[in-house]
């Protein structure tokens, strides 16, 4: 992770922002399409002197912030590892190479935060990524057609479904539409409201040729909507081929600790 940038997309799954209590944060952000995501935020910038320079991915543990008054919530997402190509200081093309389950855990009650990024990188283990799966083509007919995302939280002997089980095709923007939107945002997003100027970030990072971008969190199940993370909890985010596995078989595998094939992307993080 130390060689790349980490970005995330806000508002790419209907009703997630409302559930997370973040809709008001984006009230000043206007979009041409009512279904469009709200914007892109950084969660890691290599070499930055700010908190965003802290390598915040740990695939085994999620470290809560030192301030114990802050509420942290899991955000189950899909991450894309992408190759970037530039022309005249602008992003020319984005090529997704791999995808994986991702936890974009976020602070929910930091009233001092003025940018969405300030809620994202709160410790050396505020993010986690599962085993990565090769993308044959990021378009209809490709491998992502067959994948769904689900998340669980284990607390003592109880396992709850934290986020809805959702097909990747359920993202508001996906495939070519998503890539065109990301390219536009990377080139034109300005420092406004809770968002930041992304072209400046790319320039200051010497135009990296690779990035991880998380493409939006799913909606929460009722049990996960107001359940904040506590030490000892175990977070699971799972991306699976729904033509080969159903939800009950994935749930039982997580519950029983059964081994699943590498074609299933699994993130398991113990909260500390």
Across the structure, where does each feature detected by a protein language model lie?
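Glycine-enriched loop-and-adjacent helix/strand subsegments that border the catalytic/binding cleft
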Residues: 2-203, 227, 249-271
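Glycine-rich beta-strand-to-loop/alpha-helix junction loops that act as flexible
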Residues: 9-11, 209-222
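Short, charged beta-turn/beta-strand-edge "cap" motif at the junction between a beta-strand
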Residues: 14, 217-223, 240-245
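Loop/turn positions that initiate beta-strands
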Residues: 208-210, 230-234
